[in-house]
Regions:
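Conserved pre-motif I regulatory segment
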Residues: 1-38
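Conserved nucleotide-binding/hydrolysis micro-motifs of P-loop NTPases
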Residues: 65-67, 89-91, 115-117, 139-140, ...
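Conserved interdomain hinge at the start of the Helicase C-terminal
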Residues: 205-225
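Walker A/P-loop
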Residues: 30-49, 59-62, 171
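Post-DEXD/H (motif II) to motif III coupling segment of the RecA-like Helicase ATP-binding lobe
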Residues: 126-197, 215
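Pre-Walker A (Motif I) flank of P-loop NTPase domains
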Residues: 29-35, 56-57, 105-107, 167
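Conserved helix/coil segment N-terminal to the catalytic DExD/H
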Residues: 41, 48, 89-132, 140-146
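Conserved nucleic-acid-binding Ia/Ib motif block in the N-terminal RecA-like helicase ATPase lobe
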Residues: 58-60, 65-114, 118, 192-195
Length: 225
C-alpha cells in the first residue's frame, strides 16, 4: 500500500498533518531525521507508516512503559502486529516475544532503552533485519534536558554493533538548540533531515490588557465566555 492508503486504512485519516509527510518521505529515502513536533501532532504516524512500508523491523525506543502498551494496543486494534519489550513482562513473556520477533511476526517492536544492551536482546538484534530505529522522547539523551536518562546514551553504542546501520528517526515534543545538537551528536545522526512544526496554533493567541477596573473586566469576560 502507499503511504496515503496506509494512513486511511489503519489510522482513519484522509490527509497528513503538517510535517508528517516530509518526515515519512525522508525516512523512506534512507535519511536520518530529527523531528521536533508538539504533543498531539502525530509523531507516531511519522515512523509507523514508513515502518509498514519497509521490509525489515522497526525498533521504537521509548522510556515510558505505559506509552508502549498504549501504542501497541492501538496498533493491534487496527490490524498491525506489534509488541513491546520492557520490565513489565515476565521472563517467559519476554522470551516468547523475542521468539516471535525472530520469526518475523512483528514489523514494529517497542523496546525500553535499558534492554538494548542485554545479552538476550543483542542476540536477537544481531540476527534480525532492523531497517529503522525510531527514538521517541529523544531529548532524554541530552544532559541539557530535564528528563536526561543515561540509558539513552547506549543507543549509539547499540547501533554501532548492528551488522547493517538502520535509518534513525529522533522525535521529541520540545528541544532547545543545545538539546537538538546533543540529540544529533549523541545518537550519531548522519546529515539528518531536521524539522520543527506545529507550534503556531492559529486558534490560540496571547493578549495583554491593562483595564482600570480589573474585577469588572474579569466579571465581564466570564459572562461573555
Amino acid at each position: 500500500m502507499t503511504k496515503q492508503e496506509l494512513l486511511k486504512t489503519h489510522f482513519g485519516y484522509d490527509t497528513f498533518r503538517e510535517g508528517q509527510e516530509a518526515v515519512i518521505d525522508a525516512l523512506l529515502a534512507g535519511k536520518d531525521v530529527l523531528a521536533v513536533m508538539p504533543t498531539g501532532a502525530g509523531k507516531s504516524i511519522c515512523y509507523q507508516v514508513p515502518a509498514l512500508m519497509m521490509k525489515g523491523i522497526t525498533l521504537v525506543i521509548s522510556p515510558l512503559i505505559s506509552l508502549m502498551k498504549d501504542q501497541v494496543r492501538s496498533l493491534n486494534q487496527v490490524g498491525i502486529s506489534a509488541a513491546y519489550l520492557n520490565s513489565s513482562l515476565t521472563q517467559g513473556q519476554y522470551f516468547t516475544a523475542l521468539r516471535y520477533a525472530k520469526a518475523g511476526r512483528y514489523p514494529i517492536i517497542y523496546v525500553a532503552p535499558e534492554r538494548l544492551t542485554t545479552e538476550a536482546f543483542l542476540d536477537f538484534a544481531l540476527s534480525a533485519d532492523i531497517s529503522m530505529i525510531a527514538v521517541d522522547e529523544s531529548h532524554c539523551v541530552s544532559q541539557w534536558g530535564q528528563d536526561f536518562r543515561p540509558s539513552y546514551l547506549k543507543i549509539a553504542e547499540f547501533v554501532a554493533q548492528l551488522p547493517k546501520r538502520p535509518v534513525i528517526g529522533a522525535f521529541t515534543a520540545t528541544a532547545t538548540k543545545e538539546v537538538r545538537e546533543d540529540i544529533a551528536r549523541l545518537l550519531g545522526l548522519q546529515n539528518p533531515f531536521c524539522t520543527t512544526t506545529g507550534f503556531d496554533r492559529e486558534n490560540l493567541y496571547f493578549a495583554v490588557k491593562t483595564p482600570k477596573d480589573k474585577y469588572k473586566e474579569v466579571h465581564d469576560y466570564i459572562l461573555e465566555h
